[in-house]
Amino acid sequence: MKMADAKQKRNEQLKRWIGSETDLEPPLLKKKKTKVKFDDGAVFLAACSSGDTEEVLRMLDRGADINYANVDGLTALHQACIDDNVDMVTFLVEHGACINQPDNEGWIPLHAAASCGYLDIAEYLISQGASVGVVNSEGETPLDIAEEEAMEELLQNEINRQGVDIEAARKEEERIMLRDARQWLNSGQINDVRHTKSGGTALHVAAAKGYAEVLKLLIQAGYDVNIKDYDGWTPLHAAAHWGKEEACRILVEHLCDMDVVNKVGQTAFDVADEDILGYLEELQKKQNLLLSEKKDVKKSPLIETTTTGDNNQSVKPLKSKETLLLEPEKTAPRIETLEPEKVDEEEGEGKKDESSCSSEEEEEEDSESENEADKTKSSVPSSVSNSTPTTAPSSITVTSPTTPSNQVTTPTSPTKKVSTPAGKLSPKEEDRKDESPASWRLGLRKTGSYGALAEISTTKEAQKEKDTAGVMRSASSPRLSSSLDNKDKEKEKEKTRLAYVAPTIPRRHVSTSDIDEKENRDSAASLVRSGSYTRRRWEEDLKNSDGTASTNRTSSYQRSTSHTLALGRTSSSRDLPAKSSSASSLEPNNSKAWQPSSYYQSYSIHRSGSFGRRHEDPLSSTSSSTTTTTTTSSVTSPTGHRSLLSRYWAEESAEKEKEKEKESATVIPTINTAGTTTTTSTTGTVLGSDGRERRRSYLTPVRDEESESQRKARSRQARQSRRSTQGVTLTDLQEAEKTIGRSRPTRPREDEKEEKEKQDKEKQEEKKETETKEDDYRSRYRSFEEKYRTSLASSTTASSTIPSSSSSSSSSLYSTSSLNRPNSLTGLTSTYSRSTRDTDRESDRKEKDEDRDGDDKSQPRSIRDRRRPREKRRSTGVSFWTQDSDENEPDHPSDSEGSTKGEPQSDRLSSNDPLSTSTSSTDRYESLSSRGIGESRRPYSRFEKDDSTDYKKLYEQILAENEKLKAQLRDTELELSDLKLQLEKATQRQERFADRSQLEMEKRERRALERKISEMEEELKMLPDLKADNQRLKDENGALIRVISKLSK
């Protein structure tokens, strides 16, 4: 039964098979042998690459080309150099391979060897005559692309040995093209050969590489500006693709079709570099305007006949053949003239652009043709310098003389021979033609170069003479405006022309001779442009100039292109020692008085540039005329004048001290040590530590709290109305402590509180005036005082001499609450004066000393009496310091006691830092110890009848307390260093933890990647199995087909 079913199914299959596609196929498959035929050159390259020299020899015998290049232009020698196959390189060179064969990018085999760093191959190639000065398409020599030092050294030595000029090598192609273009122009016939692969012409190459001069000559020789290569690219496509703005401009000027498409439908805009797209759109607008205006004008297809010889003629680049024929003769003298210029330009600009030379030559030739036209005119002097400018500062008004009608220049067509050959030119004309480019090129340089202003000064007289004969066109005005902007034709009727400034003018050198022209031309408007580099020289000229030069210089309104310099501004007061207008008039070197024409400059002199603004801003905003005048004179006055001036200020401020306390402080400038920077005490900017130290040392505090001299006078008045033994009550002391405690946060109101406090004390003291004290207590008090003085006499003499001498010789102006003076200077009295909390007790103590000195005439005067009051001190040439400066510097409070000691500035500066120096530390302990002394003195100052006070013991206690405090300080310093160490360890630990976490993250990522790799490896292992399964299925399928075909038979 099963067999029957199987047969039935099989029969059904066979029925379906009949007539199927497989059944219609022949039973025997036609087996065609597939043959791949390679090009002989490709086989040759493969044989060379495999190193099979025998096969290479056989192929060479059969006629294979040893210099065959693949699609990239690589030859077998290139490939052998890349593969580092020295044997094959030697073999190929010996059998005649071209050693300097370039590939599509211009690389020769030496480029390849230098790039890969194969020193032995490079040495061999050089020994066989490989050129070290060959440049590739990007202008790079083998030295430029060498990376290893040994290779660079080898190539550099070879360059030096052969004397190769690299710059000349870079411009070799342009020079050859220029020579050929001139030859074609002279012969009137173009012998150009298209590139075998791309179909590119000389015009394509010149446009792509930006050879502007070659481009012009080729167009004049009769090249079609819309010529296409094999891909349909025009020269405009090439120039736009490689971003050559100058080439684009020249092609557009000559009315090339900007909408031509290549074989893939792209216009020049589609293939253009994105940086040049905007410029191309602008050129298209100009071309459309030009075409619309020239529709009805009948013109020659190549050279337009100009009706005027004006130097602003409409189409300048279209030169006559006569001018171009003369260029070979002019080349030699021009090159000689340009040699120093090239050196300067290389210094200023570094590596120049390839096309900079050609753009300079283009400027040259234009100027030549213009100057020729000018010299053939009647000598009508230009009235430019006398004309009144009415235009905006950006435009320059130029009036040009009219050319007589009988002197119209009509250039010949380029296809004809020139009627006047170069040899027949008169020597006078040759001289003139050589003169004009040299003088033009003399000024052709960037304004920012270092030597620009020197050039201006040397050529200024020559330029003035030239301006009377004719006006040269500015190098900075773009060519496009002169040829495409035909609105100029209307302006030519009025004999004026405004220079159009294009947004981007590439590779143009701004001529400094034009700056001279503008300076002479616009002397009425007095417009001078200067670069940021040349400003310093101008300032030196201003400084050293005589009266006449300074007058001329000042009447001109200076205009600068630098960011930091503005109209009539000085760059920075550091760089310009005395450049203000009033400064020049006050200098002793300047013999002539300043002219009235300097008004605008002196008006704007206080407006500094961005760098000098900090010091000069307060001056410009000063309301007081006296302050401004003093500022200007203090900037420039010499040292003697400065000391005299500061003395005057010291006397004046002493007289007006009381008025200044009530009024808001006027800004009084202080003279800096250099004498160049004018700073005010209210300047908000934070100076450095040196500046702060300098300023503090020169400022005299007018009145912060009550001055020492005023306090002395007040205490004398109080002593006249009461006895010296009269005490101060406990309530007085408590009130004084409260007042001083409150005065800490409220420093500006401390003066008023102290005055009230003193008045209250005087009233109380007058009430107690009637009270009598026992005479025996007074005598006892004096005896104790004398005992104390004798016990401390030895220590006092040693320590008091130095401070007293230093106090008379130095005048430090800031006083701090902790002064570095010994305890025994004036006994315990000076200890009291160190603490501002004990000011009342200190004044009381001084009064008692005064009475005691009055009774005992034999006692020497105390150091306090030897000090001069502030008003009687002699001025040291420093101006007084106002109250505002103390408010601006709350870090350094000036206490009531003036600093009479010769304390160094560093000590004063560091007095706020308890750990800075040991002297400041001891000052802190002495000020702290004064509290303990105050507490121990309080019962005695209330005149209780306690005669058991032992001053020596007190002194020893104070010393012991000081030692304890010093020990505590050492302990705290040690603790601080320990804490710092712990902090550093903690930070290092944190960093380590961070590093660890980072490492863990990396490890995790690595594990994940490794897992992925292992999974992929597993899949790769499965791949052969899958392939085997696939093959098996294919085989089974083939077997089934064969079985079916057999069964069908």
Curated annotation (Swiss-Prot):
<feature type="compositionally biased region" description="Basic and acidic residues">
    <location>
        <begin position="747"/>
        <end position="789"/>
    </location>
</feature>
<dbReference type="GO" id="GO:0019208">
    <property type="term" value="F:phosphatase regulator activity"/>
</dbReference>
<keyword id="KW-0677">Repeat</keyword>
<feature type="compositionally biased region" description="Polar residues">
    <location>
        <begin position="303"/>
        <end position="315"/>
    </location>
</feature>
<dbReference type="GO" id="GO:0031672">
    <property type="term" value="C:A band"/>
</dbReference>
<feature type="compositionally biased region" description="Basic and acidic residues">
    <location>
        <begin position="319"/>
        <end position="341"/>
    </location>
</feature>
<dbReference type="GO" id="GO:0019901">
    <property type="term" value="F:protein kinase binding"/>
</dbReference>
<feature type="compositionally biased region" description="Basic residues">
    <location>
        <begin position="712"/>
        <end position="722"/>
    </location>
</feature>
<dbReference type="InterPro" id="IPR036770">
    <property type="entry name" value="Ankyrin_rpt-contain_sf"/>
</dbReference>
<feature type="repeat" description="ANK 6">
    <location>
        <begin position="231"/>
        <end position="260"/>
    </location>
</feature>
<feature type="repeat" description="ANK 4">
    <location>
        <begin position="138"/>
        <end position="164"/>
    </location>
</feature>
<dbReference type="InterPro" id="IPR051226">
    <property type="entry name" value="PP1_Regulatory_Subunit"/>
</dbReference>
<feature type="compositionally biased region" description="Low complexity">
    <location>
        <begin position="665"/>
        <end position="686"/>
    </location>
</feature>
<dbReference type="GO" id="GO:0007165">
    <property type="term" value="P:signal transduction"/>
</dbReference>
<dbReference type="GO" id="GO:0030018">
    <property type="term" value="C:Z disc"/>
</dbReference>
<dbReference type="GO" id="GO:0046982">
    <property type="term" value="F:protein heterodimerization activity"/>
</dbReference>
<dbReference type="InterPro" id="IPR002110">
    <property type="entry name" value="Ankyrin_rpt"/>
</dbReference>
<comment type="subunit">
    <text>PP1 comprises a catalytic subunit, and one or several targeting or regulatory subunits. Ppp1r12a mediates binding to myosin.</text>
</comment>
<feature type="compositionally biased region" description="Basic and acidic residues">
    <location>
        <begin position="702"/>
        <end position="711"/>
    </location>
</feature>
<dbReference type="GO" id="GO:0004857">
    <property type="term" value="F:enzyme inhibitor activity"/>
</dbReference>
<feature type="compositionally biased region" description="Low complexity">
    <location>
        <begin position="571"/>
        <end position="592"/>
    </location>
</feature>
<feature type="repeat" description="ANK 5">
    <location>
        <begin position="198"/>
        <end position="227"/>
    </location>
</feature>
<dbReference type="GO" id="GO:0030510">
    <property type="term" value="P:regulation of BMP signaling pathway"/>
</dbReference>
<keyword id="KW-0963">Cytoplasm</keyword>
<dbReference type="GO" id="GO:0030155">
    <property type="term" value="P:regulation of cell adhesion"/>
</dbReference>
<feature type="compositionally biased region" description="Basic and acidic residues">
    <location>
        <begin position="426"/>
        <end position="436"/>
    </location>
</feature>
<dbReference type="GO" id="GO:0060028">
    <property type="term" value="P:convergent extension involved in axis elongation"/>
</dbReference>
<dbReference type="GO" id="GO:0001889">
    <property type="term" value="P:liver development"/>
</dbReference>
<feature type="compositionally biased region" description="Polar residues">
    <location>
        <begin position="820"/>
        <end position="829"/>
    </location>
</feature>
<dbReference type="GO" id="GO:0051017">
    <property type="term" value="P:actin filament bundle assembly"/>
</dbReference>
<feature type="repeat" description="ANK 2">
    <location>
        <begin position="72"/>
        <end position="101"/>
    </location>
</feature>
<dbReference type="GO" id="GO:0017020">
    <property type="term" value="F:myosin phosphatase regulator activity"/>
</dbReference>
<dbReference type="GO" id="GO:0072357">
    <property type="term" value="C:PTW/PP1 phosphatase complex"/>
</dbReference>
<dbReference type="GO" id="GO:0005737">
    <property type="term" value="C:cytoplasm"/>
</dbReference>
<dbReference type="InterPro" id="IPR017401">
    <property type="entry name" value="MYPT1/MYPT2/Mbs85"/>
</dbReference>
<dbReference type="Pfam" id="PF12796">
    <property type="entry name" value="Ank_2"/>
</dbReference>
<dbReference type="GO" id="GO:0071889">
    <property type="term" value="F:14-3-3 protein binding"/>
</dbReference>
<feature type="compositionally biased region" description="Basic and acidic residues">
    <location>
        <begin position="934"/>
        <end position="947"/>
    </location>
</feature>
<feature type="repeat" description="ANK 1">
    <location>
        <begin position="39"/>
        <end position="68"/>
    </location>
</feature>
<dbReference type="Pfam" id="PF15898">
    <property type="entry name" value="PRKG1_interact"/>
</dbReference>
<dbReference type="GO" id="GO:0070650">
    <property type="term" value="P:actin filament bundle distribution"/>
</dbReference>
<feature type="compositionally biased region" description="Low complexity">
    <location>
        <begin position="473"/>
        <end position="484"/>
    </location>
</feature>
